[in-house]
Curated annotation (Swiss-Prot):
Predominant subcellular localization, coarse grouping: membrane
Residue ranges, Cytoplasmic side: 1-108, 631-706
Protein location: Cell membrane
Encoding gene per record: SLC6A9
PROSITE patterns reported for this sequence: NA_NEUROTRAN_SYMP_1, NA_NEUROTRAN_SYMP_2, NA_NEUROTRAN_SYMP_3
Extracellular side: 209-285
Region feature Disordered, mapped onto this chain: 1-26
Provenance organism: Homo sapiens
Protein name, per record: Sodium- and chloride-dependent glycine transporter 1
Record PTM Phosphoserine, positions in chain: 673, 698
Function: Sodium- and chloride-dependent glycine transporter. Essential for regulating glycine concentrations at inhibitory glycinergic synapses.
Length: 706
């Protein structure tokens, strides 16, 4: 080792977990690491010009260990960390990463991820896709796509975030030129977080409106109803608070004039809740009841995330499990109703001829891709709070299967009630089936009015929607907050993370106000159709290419083996390299070929609105090439090819976040020079230096003399 290399190298001997530091017995056992925090000991003797650095450091270590100075130093170091807030409570003593924190236990992570993946789409989109694409036959391509695309991508994102212990921006130290992928994920999460909370606020509004003896959308005798209203129930027979029976003449009138007549639930939704304007450009007034519910929704999200994953991890014990209780209650009630079996058979009866249609496979792939939350950044973020050796392979399988099983289960709940409604009206199930907001706020609420004690069932249904939405919203907000905090990375923002969460929540509330106007539903559906559509496919495809082919599949497989103790199974290796990217490309092509201009009921969106939608979609995708060009301009290199190589190779700080996990090829050997960006203290003439490596290299304790 040359003299220049010895200027800041330090010794880090092996440590015994149960008995504290163990002094090395030979220079070969000394590992040289960069200086991060320094404690100073009195001058030592024994180092001569002919003595090697390792031998000198070894003598210092033996002297400090045998004299008891080293344990005192380590105790003082721990005390200083505690005083600085690094060890604030007994809970964090269980954390591996004192800087960022970890989940309280593994159940919290699994429940949070289940709540993130299982959202409103499982209830209002999957059942509709299933019956439209061949009923039970749709299950075949659905689970094929789950096995070959869904679970592999889910595992990739979980392992990516867990290995680096960073959010969707920090993980791109793996290949800095592709950091734009992380920014694209942030943009997507921002869009979804804005409009998703508006859907939750509408569910809050319906929940509060259900706290009444008679549901306000049950009859046509309200001030907002028109002459075209024809309900299943006849308000004229409402006497002494009794529930009327549907009159055959009224039903006949409703069915014969279905094109001209509207249901009371539809008029309640369109004329009272939304006060819908006639055009997307006509904002009208802000609906104050919805604005208030939006504030409640954002307040709930903020309070649940006020301490990051420490608080949200406790909330999900309820928010991620109670929806299953409600689903089970609604299922038991639904299957006992007359006509429920017809609805379930309509949902499950296979039409095998549709398996040969490309559209069915495209819908199956798209539903798997979107329902699991891939490329949103949330999976990477949630996994970044795992402990390093957590078995994320097992978690990815459990969570993915739970998500898909929930979708199938929700289909039974939805179609049992819709079958009852169709039987009551004497029409085919297809006449009452719907998806999206039309199912959640029109069709299903109307079906609930036919049940005894209908307000109770309505309360349960909308409470379930609220919890399903909040589970996803927690992760969307945490994705943005974690990305900001990790990117800044200093001690101040770590201590002020609550204020960052508050700032993001307030910004989300303000940006959501236009969606509570009379034209709000038009903008909500525009964002839903464009902001998180093909852009997710592009982001996910580039992520696969960057990890598997730029960073290298062998490197990534070795990383996973170091983290989990075993390499990814051969099936996942093949899927990551070939199958999943091919499926993603198929989804992208299918999305382009099957593109149709957006409509809402019979309203056709104008060209300028569609253009805004495409701009929203492109805004997340363009982050990738724009940041790549920026990175190339900032990277050293004599030629473009050299710059490209330097910009795509992993940065110096890529790898496990904690030094105790940086083994093998990640184990540092020689301290970098000051020009590498590390601060190296000069050797002091009158005292020897034994640097004690801390958990945060950006801050340094003061001179400590013993």
């Amino acid at each position: 080792m040359s003299g220049g290399d010895t200027r800041a190298a330090i010794a880090r001997p092996r440590m015994a977990a149960a008995h504290g530091p163990v002094a090395p017995s030979s220079p070969e056992q000394v590992t040289l690491l960069p200086v991060q925090r320094s404690f100073f000991l009195p001058p030592f003797s024994g180092a001569t010009p002919s003595t090697s650095l390792a031998e000198s450091v070894l003598k210092v270590w033996h002297g400090a260990y045998n004299s008891g100075l080293l344990p005192q130093l380590m105790a003082q170091h721990s005390l200083a960390m505690a005083q600085n807030g690094a060890v604030p409570s007994e809970a964090t003593k269980r954390d591996q990463n004192l800087k960022r924190g970890n989940w309280g236990n593994q159940i919290e992570f699994v429940l949070t991820s289940v709540g993130y993946a299982v959202g409103l789409g499982n209830v209002w989109r999957f059942p509709y896709l299933c019956y439209r694409n061949g009923g039970g036959a749709f299950m075949f391509p659905y689970f094929i796509m789950l096995i070959f695309c869904g679970i592999p991508l889910f595992f990739m994102e979980l392992s990516f975030g867990q290995f680096a212990s960073q959010g969707c921006l920090g993980v791109w130290r793996i290949s800095p030129m592709f950091k734009g992928v992380g920014y694209g994920m942030m943009v997507v999460s921002t869009y979804i977080g804005i409009y998703y909370n508006v859907v939750i606020c509408i569910a809050f509004y319906y929940f509060f409106s259900s706290m009444t003896h008679v549901l306000p959308w049950a009859y046509c005798n309200n001030p907002w109803n028109t002459h075209d209203c024809a309900g299943v129930l006849d308000a004229s027979n409402l006497t002494n608070g009794s529930r009327p029976a549907a009159l055959p003449s009224n039903l006949s009138h409703l069915l014969n004039h279905s094109l001209q007549r509207t249901s009371p639930s539809e008029e309640y939704w369109r004329l009272y809740v939304l006060k819908l304007s006639d055009d997307i450009g006509n904002f009208g007034e802000v609906r104050l009841p919805l604005l208030g519910c939006l504030g409640v929704s954002w307040l709930v999200v903020f309070l649940c995330l006020i301490r990051g994953v420490k608080s949200s991890g406790k909330v999900v014990y309820f928010t991620a499990t109670f929806p299953y209780v409600v689903l089970t209650i609604l299922f038991v009630r639904g299957v006992t109703l007359e006509g429920a079996f017809d609805g379930i058979m309509y949902y499950l009866t296979p039409q095998w001829d549709k398996i040969l249609e490309a559209k069915v496979w495209g819908d199956a792939a798209s539903q798997i891709f979107y329902s699991l939350g891939c490329a949103w950044g949330g999976l990477i973020t949630m996994a970044s709070y795992n402990k390093f050796h957590n078995n994320c392979y097992r978690d990815s399988v459990i969570i993915s299967i739970t998500n898909c099983a929930t979708s199938v289960y929700a289909g039974f709940v939805i179609f049992s009630i819709l079958g009852f409604m169709a039987n009551h009206l004497g029409v085919d199930v297809s006449r009452v089936a719907d998806h999206g907001p039309g199912l959640a706020f029109v069709a299903y609420p109307e079906a609930l009015t036919l049940l005894p004690i209908s307000p109770l069932w309505s309360l349960l249904f909308f409470f379930m929607l609220i919890l399903l939405g909040l589970g996803t919203q927690f992760c969307l907000l945490e994705t943005l907050v974690t990305a900001i905090v990790d990117e800044v990375g200093n001690e101040w923002i770590l201590q002020k993370k609550t204020y960052v969460t508050l700032g993001v929540a307030v910004a989300g509330f303000l940006l959501g106000i236009p969606l509570t106007s009379q034209a709000g539903i038009y903008w909500l559906l525009l964002m839903d159709n464009y902001a998180a559509s093909f852009s997710l496919v592009v982001i996910s495809c580039i992520m696969c290419v960057a990890i598997m082919y730029i960073y290298g599949h062998r490197n990534y497989f070795q990383d996973i083996q170091m983290m989990l103790g075993f390499p990814p199974p051969l099936f996942f290796q093949i899927c990551w390299r070939f199958v999943s990217p091919a499926i993603i490309f198929f989804i992208l092509v299918f999305t382009v070929i099957q593109y149709q201009p957006i409509t809402y009921n019979h309203y056709q969106y104008p060209g300028w609105a569609v253009a805004i939608g495409f701009l929203m979609a492109l805004s997340s995708v363009l982050c990738i090439p724009l940041y790549a060009m920026f990175r190339l301009c900032r990277t050293d290199g004599d030629t473009l090819l050299q710059r490209l190589k330097n910009a795509t190779k992993p940065s110096r700080d890529w790898g496990p976040a904690l030094l105790e996990h940086r083994t093998g090829r990640y184990a540092p050997t020689i301290a970098p020079s000051p020009e590498d960006g590390f601060e190296v203290q000069p050797l002091h003439p009158d005292k020897a230096q034994i640097p004690i490596v801390g958990s945060n290299g950006s801050s340094r304790l003061q001179d400590s003399r013993i």
